[in-house]
Amino acid sequence: MLINSTKTIILLHGFTSSGQSTKARYFREKLKAFPQVQFHAIDFNPTPADFEYVTTTGRINRLRQYVLDHDLGNISIIGSSYGGLIALHYAHRFGGVEKMLLLAPGLTWLSWGLSEKELEQWEKTGAAPFLHRAFGKEVPIKYYVQVDGLRYLEPIPPASPVIIIHGRSDKTVPIEPARVYAADFADSVRLIEVDADHDLNDHLELIWEYVKSFLLDAKF
């Protein structure tokens, strides 16, 4: 397979995932066959303290600083779950993103599906415990993470071409908003529905085909 130029692929993990997720390890191994491609799986939560305090705006700005620090160009993004929200807003705010492959993306801030009573309790106590899968334990999150998230309640237009792969049985991030988003921005967004729940790890081979054909424009 041939690639016409050097490229950068950034993987943005989900809210309670990490840069060492199943997807990150899978793509890192697959992309070893493409020396023209720089692969970066950014870890937004290197420690529980980072997870406790980091906001959506903070993650977007952290991604910007990472891109500048590493002088990255020809960027495409794989955004998984919450990473999809970060990808869309980063591209909209800063530009420089050629394509986005979004995997069961959160297109808006979802407040984890908490009830009004649960949100009120979170505000009252100032922090609430959330299970972080990568750390394997509950970690408190400050309420101002929720306050910041309220800035991201409406979907934004895509700044570059997007393919969304989403499971029809996803209960964590339901597929219906992705259907609406793809219909609203049909010129830029293509939705691929699969029989899967949220993590999509049973469909990594399919996702990899779109990494090659869509993000890399690989010629066979």
Which residues make up each language-model segment?
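Alpha/beta-hydrolase active-site loop
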Residues: 51-69
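The alpha/beta-hydrolase serine catalytic core
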Residues: 98-220
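Gly/Ala-rich beta-loop-alpha elbow adjacent to hydrolase catalytic centers
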Residues: 78-87
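Alpha/beta-hydrolase active-site loop signature
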Residues: 16, 43-48, 107, 198
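Short, surface-exposed alpha-helical segments at coil->helix boundaries
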Residues: 21-25, 57, 175-179
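Glycine-rich phosphate-binding loop signature in dinucleotide/nucleotide-binding domains
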Residues: 3-4, 69-73, 157-158, 218
